[in-house]
Amino acid sequence: MGDVEIPPLVKQIVRGLRGLAFLATILATSFMAASHERAIFPFDYKADYTDLMLFKAFLGANIAASLYSFFFVCLPPKSLLWRLAIVLDVIMFGLLVAMDSAAIAAAYLHKHGDSQAFWPPICSQVPTYCYRVILAISIGFGGVFMFLLIIIISISVILNPLLV
């Protein structure tokens, strides 16, 4: 089997989706890194994304995905690294889904708490922190969606000659 010929419009769409994935992941990283707030009443409390390892992992996954997306947006079209793109896209997609899902679970605990674990809700004391965390996770899911579209388009281009 020879190389699959990819139409120029599809290449432009995928490159645009990679650019959007870069923007979404870098914005999610920025909002998560900026999420910190201090509450004085009823007790002195400083909420920061570094308080939970899940949020650090979310930040790391989005940094990795944004660097990966930027690298592939800047990659020349004739490069042999494009052959690895679909495999790396699936890996990045899985990493982002896992970290975004874990981060949303932690954000849920921040919002509602867990009475059995004696984890009180903190979003009423530090609302700006919670808003930034939820915004970062929501934008991160936008990056997940971009990677999903890239994977669907790439697989359809690869399978199209086999199905016709």
From Swiss-Prot:
Extracellular compartment ranges equal 37-56, 105-132
- Please give, as recorded in its UniProt entry, the membrane topology of this protein: Multi-pass membrane protein
Q: Which GO terms describe its cellular component?
A: plasma membrane
UniProt keyword list: Cell membrane, Membrane, Transmembrane, Transmembrane helix
List where the protein spans the membrane: 16-36, 57-77, 84-104, 133-153
The subcellular location is: Cell membrane
Q: Which InterPro entries match?
A: CASP/CASPL (IPR006459), CASP_dom (IPR006702)
Do you know which Pfam families this protein is assigned to? CASP_dom
The segments annotated as topological domain Cytoplasmic are 1-15, 78-83, 154-164
Q: Which PANTHER family match?
A: CASP-LIKE PROTEIN 1U1 (PTHR33573:SF47), CASP-LIKE PROTEIN 4A4 (PTHR33573)
Record text on subunit structure and interactions: Homodimer and heterodimers.
Q: To which protein family does this belong?
A: Belongs to the Casparian strip membrane proteins (CASP) family.
Q: What is this protein called?
A: CASP-like protein 1C1
Q: Give the classification, highest ranks.
A: Eukaryota, Viridiplantae, Streptophyta, Embryophyta, Tracheophyta
